[in-house]
């Protein structure tokens, strides 16, 4: 059967529910789809539909994640809900489902719990720009003073982790009652979605960002010069644009003299294109796979950085033994792999497979990276971890 064509009539946004176990994330996800389905903006999903999450094999790790699709008046959403805490950690660190924003679910009856804090911190580290709070189970915890107290605590926590705690929308509702069709609580879901529409920013389209192409191959066309090929990760490139070649060696400046795709010449290449770029005055030996072609000044080479890393379990094809400071695996960024030595934080002697940790890495050669850059860690031909750069330093 042919797949239905995706009609792009509204801007698309990826969001997810985050928060402590049993605070009602999955019930809320089901409630959103059920309430919006009544307006023809979603297909209703029951708790069981959302809960029977398909296993996704994403970059060698198993992530259980459920994707629900729905629309509001102004936007189209893909909503990810993960059943287990470990799945959220993996999902967010690897960027398996990039979140443009998140709905933090907190049970009014429990308040802020350990995973509430961890998910907020993780959201900050992986670059989720804004969070909307849904204070759940308000049909059960009816005391407004208690609800006020929890709201105050959440706002302080958001501010502590660098979010705008004072202005973040906090909606008080009941996912369960809304799912059961109680109109008072259904209205709270509408209120929540209005807040999501207005508070969570539309993601910047990749074409609006500064140009970056990860170089996959280099060859010479006699009489014309050196061509680099690769996929345009973001931005737009035009003939005669000035570009920099960054990473592995000293940064070089050059000018684009031609752009080709499918053996046809183009005026410009944009995000998503696999293109060949002809460069002025560059010898084949001056450039290599693993470097990036970028808009001048938009990204710098770094040898040291701090990252949030998830170490794969042995069942996920990872190591059987823990890692310690001084461990020297390969770090894979885009089209390059570079050896690096890790340093664990003070007081952490080792990291077990299945754990996540913040670590500092020192590479043997500089690589073009920035906050949020994703990478894999490999040794002996197998992937042993995934990470996300939190902070670069020279």
UniProtKB/Swiss-Prot annotation:
Where do the record's region annotations for G4 lie? 136-139
Segments forming domain tr-type G: 10-204
| Record: residues binding Mg(2+) | 26
| Chain intervals for the UniProt region annotation (G3) | 81-84
Gene3D superfamilies given for it?
A: P-loop containing nucleotide triphosphate hydrolases (3.40.50.300), Translation factors (2.40.30.10)
Q: What does this protein do?
A: GTP hydrolase that promotes the GTP-dependent binding of aminoacyl-tRNA to the A-site of ribosomes during protein biosynthesis.
The protein depicted here goes by the name Elongation factor Tu
Species annotation:
Ureaplasma parvum serovar 3 (strain ATCC 700970)
């Amino acid at each position: 059967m042919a797949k239905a064509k995706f009609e792009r009539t509204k801007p698309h946004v990826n969001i997810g529910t985050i928060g402590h176990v049993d605070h009602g994330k999955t019930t809320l996800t089901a409630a959103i789809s059920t309430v919006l389905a009544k307006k023809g903006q979603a297909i209703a999903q029951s708790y069981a539909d959302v809960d029977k999450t398909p296993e996704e094999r994403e970059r060698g790790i198993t992530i259980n994640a459920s994707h629900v699709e729905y629309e509001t008046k102004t936007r189209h959403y893909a909503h990810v809900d993960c059943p287990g805490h470990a799945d959220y950690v993996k999902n967010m660190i690897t960027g398996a489902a990039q979140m443009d924003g998140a709905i933090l679910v907190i049970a009014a009856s429990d308040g802020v719990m350990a995973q509430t804090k961890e998910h907020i911190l993780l959201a900050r580290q992986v670059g989720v720009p804004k969070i909307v709070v849904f204070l759940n189970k308000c049909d059960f915890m009816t005391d407004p003073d208690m609800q006020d107290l929890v709201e105050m605590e959440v706002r302080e926590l958001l501010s502590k982790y660098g979010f705008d705690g004072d202005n973040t929308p906090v909606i008080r509702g009941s996912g369960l009652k809304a799912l059961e069709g109680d109109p008072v609580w259904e209205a709270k879901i509408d209120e929540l979605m209005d807040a999501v529409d207005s508070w969570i920013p539309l993601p910047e389209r990749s074409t609006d960002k500064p140009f970056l192409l990860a170089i996959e191959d280099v060859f010479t066309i006699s009489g014309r010069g050196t061509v680099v090929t690769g996929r345009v990760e973001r931005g737009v490139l035009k003939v005669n644009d000035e570009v920099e070649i960054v990473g592995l060696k000293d940064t070089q400046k050059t000018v684009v003299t031609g752009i080709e795709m499918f053996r046809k010449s183009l005026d410009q290449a944009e995000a998503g294109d696999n293109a060949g770029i002809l460069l002025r005055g560059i010898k084949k030996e001056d450039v290599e796979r693993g470097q990036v072609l970028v808009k001048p000044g938009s990204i710098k080479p770094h040898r040291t950085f701090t990252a949030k890393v998830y170490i794969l379990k042995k069942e996920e094809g990872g190591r059987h033994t823990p890692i310690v400071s001084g461990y020297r695996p390969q770090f894979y960024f885009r089209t390059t792999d570079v050896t690096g030595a890790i340093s664990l934080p003070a007081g952490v002697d080792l990291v077990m497979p299945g754990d996540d940790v913040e670590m500092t890495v020192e590479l043997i050669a500089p690589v073009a990276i920035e906050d949020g850059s994703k990478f894999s860690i490999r040794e002996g031909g197998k992937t042993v971890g995934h990470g996300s750069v939190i902070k670069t330093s020279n």
